A protein has these predicted regions:
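Bacterial Sec-dependent N-terminal signal peptides
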Residues: 1-25
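Generic structural signal for beta-strand residues in well-ordered domains
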Residues: 14-16, 41, 65, 130-132, ...
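A generic alpha-helix preference that emphasizes hydrophobic side chains
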Residues: 16, 45, 64, 69-70, ...
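Positively charged, low-complexity intrinsically disordered regions
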Residues: 17, 21, 32, 102-105
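Accessory beta-strand-rich segments of carbohydrate-active enzymes
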Residues: 22-32, 49-58, 80, 84-85, ...
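Mature N-terminal segment immediately following signal peptide/propeptide cleavage
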Residues: 33-54, 65-75
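Disulfide-rich extracellular domains of secreted proteins
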Residues: 63-67, 87, 157
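Aromatic- and Gly/Pro-rich amphipathic surface segment
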Residues: 71-110
Length: 165
């Protein structure tokens, strides 16, 4: 069967994303879910990557299959922009001591840095299982905080504004 290669790209402000849990039901009439979380299972590389919005190409380009995401940082999904930046050692752990105290200046405060400081593209490449070929598919996000544009294979699918809509 033909394998379909897809890329999902999300531009988010103050990101909090949760992808659907990986559950395959035994009932043939039940809906199937494929997890897009960043935690791999069974040796698969389920990684997301991220790049500052202003430093990346257009949504059409970065969401296209075959796009080379060189220089992108690993991202944690579900998580936040700050969570992924801490993971990549860009900023110190905010819950250690008083690292997150605004007066220390270790972690930029959105009030000082501006909302655009936390605008990032999040990207993931995945294959749709052959058992789902020809079927109507849904991308379900369990929480985007606060705004996102969703792209798939070079096409903008839509935008969201407001938590958990």
């Amino acid at each position: 069967m033909k394998k379909i290669s897809s890329a999902v790209l999300i531009c988010m402000m103050v990101l909090q994303v949760g992808a659907q849990q990986g559950v395959y039901e035994m009932n043939s009439s039940a809906r199937q879910s494929v997890s897009l979380n960043s935690t791999g299972s069974a040796g698969k590389n389920d990684s997301w990557s991220m790049k500052k919005y202003s430093d990346a190409a257009t949504g059409e380009q970065v969401s296209s299959p075959g796009y080379q995401a060189d220089g992108w940082l690993p991202a944690i999904v579900p998580g936040t922009v700050l969570n992924s930046l801490v993971y990549n050692k860009v900023y110190p752990e905010p819950y250690y001591g008083d690292n997150n105290r605004r007066s220390r200046g270790l972690i930029p405060d959105i009030h000082d840095a501006g909302a655009g400081f936390y605008h990032y593209w999040f990207r993931k490449t995945f294959k749709v299982p052959a058992t789902l070929n020809g079927k109507k598919l849904w991308l379900k996000f369990h929480g985007i905080n606060y705004r996102a544009g969703v792209w798939l294979n070079g096409k903008k699918l839509g935008t969201m504004a407001g938590m958990f809509q």
